[in-house]
């Protein structure tokens, strides 16, 4: 005959067993309301820890790999929601079109979504066109100088705040700016140093300036009000940083030489 203590213990175990699926269902309802984990990504040949690329079979990138693994842990399929840049992802945050994303964080975006752990810290600078006489920030920040940035991004806002005389113009895609820089129609392009170093290899005569005007931090994010989802993605990224999953995602996407930088 069971003792009262054993009866109480058995009751608690049974209650926990019943409650756990309910908690899991509640999380899935919030983080994957369509039955799929909709991962917002931005497409660009720039690569790096934020951008994804289009491939013959689908998409590749650090957010692509992390989204696939997150969906597997939740037990749901993954669906990639494609955007041209992080500004478009931000604009869609309140429209219910995506569930999770990885993108650069700044105070303006914190009013539109909730951020989890930072997994990348990048140095933002400028690349100047072939044949340019610009050698540093002082010679760049002059009247008549045309600087491009990807529209409505953290880097664009940083460049506008940094440059007092040069004119900063936003464009929708990396590809468009690449063409303008190559043809000499713009004087400079603001982006993270690692991506600009790759661009410099593709456009002979360009030069990446030595100085840094902004530290850009990239983190996982969910829409406002999704507290259960935020708790889940926070644990996911904390685990991914310590168990090698994030390192593997970097290595699989041509970032073997890039360190994982957190706050």
Show the residue positions of the predicted features.
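Ligand-binding clefts/hinges and TM-proximal coupling segments of bilobed small-molecule sensing domains
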Residues: 25-26, 154-171, 208-209, 238-263
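Extracytoplasmic small-molecule ligand-binding "clamshell" domains
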Residues: 25-104
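Bilobed "Venus flytrap"/periplasmic-binding protein-like clamshell domains
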Residues: 41-46, 57-73, 105, 125-178, ...
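Periplasmic-binding protein-like
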Residues: 43, 121-131, 193, 197-238, ...
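Extended ligand-binding regions for polar small-molecule ligands
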Residues: 61-73, 138, 152-153, 219-258
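Acidic, polar ligand-binding/catalytic clefts
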Residues: 68, 72, 77-141, 207
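Short helix-initiation/N-cap motifs at beta->coil->alpha
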Residues: 80-91, 135, 154, 169-179, ...
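A ligand-binding cleft/hinge motif common to bilobed small-molecule-binding domains
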Residues: 87, 104-112, 158, 182-214
């Amino acid at each position: 005959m069971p003792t009262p203590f054993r009866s109480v213990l058995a009751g608690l175990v049974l209650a926990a067993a019943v409650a756990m699926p309910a908690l899991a269902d509640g999380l899935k309802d919030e983080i994957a309301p369509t039955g799929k984990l909709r991962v917002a990504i931005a497409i660009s040949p720039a690569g790096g820890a934020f951008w994804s690329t289009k491939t013959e079979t689908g998409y590749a990138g650090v957010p692509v790999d992390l989204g696939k693994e997150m969906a597997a842990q939740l037990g749901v399929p993954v669906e990639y929601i494609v955007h041209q840049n992080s500004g478009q992802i931000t604009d869609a945050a309140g429209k219910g079109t995506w569930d999770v994303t990885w993108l650069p964080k700044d105070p303006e975006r914190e009013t539109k979504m909730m951020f989890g752990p930072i997994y990348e810290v990048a140095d933002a600078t400028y690349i100047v066109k072939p044949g340019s006489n610009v050698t540093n920030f002082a010679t760049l920040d002059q009247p008549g100088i045309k600087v491009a940035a990807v529209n409505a991004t953290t880097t664009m806002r940083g460049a506008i705040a940094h440059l007092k005389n040069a004119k900063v113009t936003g464009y929708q895609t990396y590809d468009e700016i690449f063409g303008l820089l190559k043809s000499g129609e713009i004087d400079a392009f603001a982006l993270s140093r690692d991506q600009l170093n790759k661009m410099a290899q593709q456009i002979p005569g360009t030069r990446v300036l030595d100085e840094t005007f902004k530290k850009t931090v990239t983190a996982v994010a969910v829409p406002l009000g999704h507290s259960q989802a935020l708790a889940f993605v926070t644990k996911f990224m904390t685990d991914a940083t310590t168990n090698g999953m994030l390192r593997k995602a970097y290595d699989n996407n041509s970032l073997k030489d890039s360190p994982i930088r957190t706050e």
